[in-house]
Amino acid sequence: MKRINVDLHLLHFPKFRKFQSRKVSSSLPKLELDQKSPQETVFLLGQVLDTYPDIRTLRTVHSRIILEDLRCNSSLGVKLMRAYASLKDVASARKVFDEIPERNVIIINVMIRSYVNNGFYGEGVKVFGTMCGCNVRPDHYTFPCVLKACSCSGTIVIGRKIHGSATKVGLSSTLFVGNGLVSMYGKCGFLSEARLVLDEMSRRDVVSWNSLVVGYAQNQRFDDALEVCREMESVKISHDAGTMASLLPAVSNTTTENVMYVKDMFFKMGKKSLVSWNVMIGVYMKNAMPVEAVELYSRMEADGFEPDAVSITSVLPACGDTSALSLGKKIHGYIERKKLIPNLLLENALIDMYAKCGCLEKARDVFENMKSRDVVSWTAMISAYGFSGRGCDAVALFSKLQDSGLVPDSIAFVTTLAACSHAGLLEEGRSCFKLMTDHYKITPRLEHLACMVDLLGRAGKVKEAYRFIQDMSMEPNERVWGALLGACRVHSDTDIGLLAADKLFQLAPEQSGYYVLLSNIYAKAGRWEEVTNIRNIMKSKGLKKNPGASNVEVNRIIHTFLVGDRSHPQSDEIYRELDVLVKKMKELGYVPDSESALHDVEEEDKETHLAVHSEKLAIVFALMNTKEEEEDSNNTIRITKNLRICGDCHVAAKLISQITSREIIIRDTNRFHVFRFGVCSCGDYW
């Protein structure tokens, strides 16, 4: 709503003549009221109120109404109430309401709406209750507003009574009132009643159906929400941006089929709005599809839509997840040009994006330039240090967070503990955990406990990590046992590894990765019979190792490679160049690490299998399609991988960085690996 600041002298009455010398606003006619008739005065004052003026002007107009003895004028009263309510001054709106002697349905509706739109739901319902005493019959505008009060406050008992009142006056099946009833019952969790109202409505529009979709989605009835969308199609009701927004809670971590249905719905929409684009990007992000989110955002811009804060906060995490740094930088430039900061949400998203792209200094620049920071800002920067293996910097920043006057929350401690774990800071991690429990009195959650197990396990204290699990006050989850099993693989503890694996097979019987880990532990110990048994179990269960996948951005396009991928148009060139690189690596002493190959592969095939891991293909493709002198920090190659980098690829990346004199950054599920001149930033500790 556009609000106009009206010069006070426009009202031109004696008390305010000193304002007449000011420049008159060109947006409104000059109001000369001294010689006007009462009808003209009412008209001119009403014109000012229609502009929704600022509070100073509004009070001046109100004073003039009192001086002119126009308090009983219902037209001016209604406009005064609306203007006060728009400024969230509901008390003043109520005073105006109380001074109107004869109230009709319009006046009462405005008062109800003033309360409800400002969150005073109970007061709105009370005003509705006075209508019978005033002998005023509610209309089809009254009921939707008071039903909204019931929806927002969850007062289903009152909502049912209002439904009864609407039925008595014959309005319950009309469009506006019916929509309000569907929304009220749906949001209060009474979905069968919501459906019944919809079915009994004499006329239904897209809002009617969207209201039912919202009800199902908000009550975790995801399949029903999608079924209603399909039903809309069958009755020839077109989906709109509201339908998509209503569906968003229903398509979080859902099936690929459901995501494809929403995608199909989106592309079938005749006229797309920015809201619909934002929702579709959100659907992709809520279902771990960042590549698709980035591609859709680029398409949105190409179609002429200008992103808003919602678009940006949705797509920046996708840029981070895919290392789409060039797009992330472009969005940062847009934010600065449009002067969208200071804005904590955007600035925190920028820190996270730069951190995930391996641009630690850029993330730090955003952090340092923030006018104000919240705990999320500090946590994002601590995470940036931790993921880059700079545990000491993460711990130091955590100390500064405490000095800033903010209180670290549960997530800040998880992030700091993870940073200690990745950097091997055992004592610092122990101190952090003690600080959390003893000083801040934060009860450890499973995330904190998993970090402690990981911290102890990485430090080689596998037995202590196992005792820590045994002493836990809550039942360990998959993440806790997974951290222990990973430590057993690194430190060759077969006995405890078997115990951890047994627990994991009970908690996550369909997760192939844990079978592979146990198989690798047995293989490292030379227990080949057990390796065969594990592989046979996997085959009998139909389990396969999750395929490795790596993303790399080249010329602002994200390219995805799978292990052994031959689908890329440049595949033949990639494999030829890879063969050349492997020969050069062998000249420097490279020997393929057969421990990193699948143990059910024949020995002579292991080297071939290792050579086609996804990150190797992505590196070669980037080397072929970029030049060292191009922009972007000497054209660093940035790769994201869906699995932990294997030992062989780690060695290969070091050698390739040495051979090509190129910086290569690989972000796997654990941390960043920055390869420069044959050395990795992790110090071979990951």
From Swiss-Prot:
PPR repeats: 73-103, 104-138, 139-173, 174-204, 205-239, 240-272, 273-307, 308-342, 343-373, 374-408, 409-439, 445-475
Gene Ontology biological process terms, A to Z: RNA modification
Annotated region described as Type E motif, given as residue ranges: 480-555
Pfam family, one: E_motif
GO molecular function, one term: zinc ion binding
UniProt region (Type DYW motif), positions on chain: 587-686
Region of interest (Type E(+) motif), residue spans: 556-586
Keywords: Repeat
NCBIfam families, per database record: PPR
UniProt family annotation: Belongs to the PPR family. PCMP-H subfamily.
PANTHER family, per database record: PENTATRICOPEPTIDE REPEAT-CONTAINING PROTEIN, TETRATRICOPEPTIDE-LIKE HELICAL DOMAIN SUPERFAMILY, DYW DOMAIN-CONTAINING PROTEIN
Protein name: Putative pentatricopeptide repeat-containing protein At3g49142
Protein's organism: Arabidopsis thaliana
Gene: PCMP-H77
